Amino acid sequence: MARIDGRTKLGMIGWTLLVGFALVAGAVAQPAEPAIRPPAAAAPLDDGQWTMPAKNYASTRYSELAEITEDNVKTLQVAFTFSTGVNKGQEAAPLVVGDTMYIVTPFPNILYALDLARPGAPMKWKFEPNPEPAAQGVACCDVVNRGAAFSNGRIYFNTLDGHTIAVDAATGKPVWNTHIGNINIGETITMAPLMVKGKVLVGNSGGEMGVRGWIKALDAGDGHVIWTAYSTGPDAEVLIGPDFKPHYDMDKGKDLGVTSWPPDAWKIGGGNVWGWISYDPDLDLIFHGTGNPGPWNPDLRPGDNKWTSGIFARDPDTGNAKWFYQWTPHDLHDYDGINEQVLLDMTWQGKPRKVLVRPERNGYVYLLDRTTGEVLSAVPFGPVNSSKGVDLKTGRLIVNPEKETSTGKVVRNICPTASGLKDWQPSAFSPKTGLLYIPHNNLCMDEEGVEVNYIAGTPYVGMNVRMIAGPGGHRGAFTAWNVAAAKPAWILKENFPVWSGAVVTAGNVVFYGTMEGWFKAVSATTGKLLWQFKTSSGIIGQPITYRGPDGHQYVAILSGVGGWAGAIVSGDLDPRDATAALGFANVMKDLKDVTTPGGTLYVFRLP
């Protein structure tokens, strides 16, 4: 990595050199930097349960369970399976609380409870919320659901038609149901909620429908809305006040959520909060991303389009913003900003720092000081030509003018695509290795801006997209990233995008799934394939591991292809339409040849 005038720069050639190093190094143990750990308050000692999709507030997706090791993982066998009854994209993480597993399906968002204390884990109960069927027609990218959360004897989850529901974890009886989304304007909810200090944190989807983004805090007791913070509009509605202290000048000024847009465009400007939220109890701050501005055609929204494609730090009690950083000002390519942020404490350039690490959709692994929002490092983790780096003095992404899109102009070979070098699929961090394990894409695209008018409840995109395989011809990869060194330790190439999440354990094993349907275990140190199992459908879910009632370690994954990347299968799209699924259909034509729709839970254990 070269540093020039305060900028972090690593182009396609520099990335190729890094890749060459990592592929060679993949067979050799890389020395881990010491003392990189999540804050103890955000990642308490592992009790063997899995009560939230990210495992803990620090979003490490790391388990201290170690019965399954590099040496014995090859003997893993199926303990039980369960059909969800829904053959759509299964993106959720199962939860395990005590002797019960909880699963939320894609639409119609059925919540199941399985009895882990009985042979075969039979169903304890199921809750059917009966969401509005019309929600399916306004969902951007399949009818997915990313999971539930447990707190104080209740399961909390969202439905596609905009409801947040609390259910008694023991009985399956509903406790409350709050309607917070409006499908008539194209608003849906697909994210997993996060429970913080007696509040249910929820955000909306709908950026491709011109829906204004927000995050809400609901009272966990009765479901009433405590506060709402919008991603666009006046400071008062974004909950920006005197405590707001962004690090960079580009994020300072009054009512930037209005003035950085054409008149009234912020009202339909997106910035939806449909991804991951982390929480630092010591700082008492939540961290959440904001989605892309709408429409995709940048000619229709000149300006930085605050506060989209960025990250907020907020007070969970009031929602008041403390700082903000914009990953991609005036987002040209739907790079969004909702990925997971892993909270870590480490030494950076000789100083102890409270950081968050974020593998972002625009192609960079960012290291931010989570107390201020200062960018400490920003390095590509794959092929990037849409930008030339990040200016560490100003914090601003350096756009490559050759890849700027506009109305009526076809721009070819933009890397990464609108789906990003990595989309929502969450990474995992191991304090044993100091490595972040990143499931991601390797895709490029052609884009053409087109005119579009806003009509409530209909697509508001304004862009023709055709995706193609990235450099090397493989369409996905699984990368182990050395956080301290800001470079890859090893890289595994995959034929299709790796659209599943990852989990890493104290047994030094990393689990992830492929869109062909392989569930894989690899060495956390070297990336060596240790075990794989072919499931009945492509995998886009989030693996977990837990201690069962018998005291043994189990690993679970939902299999069922779909989501944006797998829409050609789950939506049975015509592969002759190169722009179907916002361009994804073109690069995934052959997915139909290797997998079919499904919806099955697989759980594994040692003999």
PLM feature spans:
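Beta-propeller blade signature
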Residues: 213-224, 304-318, 372, 475-483, ...
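Blade/loop signatures of beta-propeller domains
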Residues: 33-78, 240-250, 399-403, 467-468, ...
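Repeat-blade elements of multi-bladed beta-propeller folds
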Residues: 50-54, 89-110, 137-164, 188-208, ...
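Short, conserved, GDST-rich strand-edge loop motifs in beta-rich repeat architectures
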Residues: 202-213, 261-262, 288-305, 442-471, ...
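N-terminal cofactor/phosphate-binding cores enriched in small/glycine residues
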Residues: 63-181, 505
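Extracytoplasmic beta-rich repeat domains
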Residues: 82-93, 126-149, 177-192, 230-276, ...
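Bacterial N-terminal signal peptides
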Residues: 12-26
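Repeat-solenoid scaffold signature
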Residues: 188-224, 331-390, 403-415, 419-424, ...
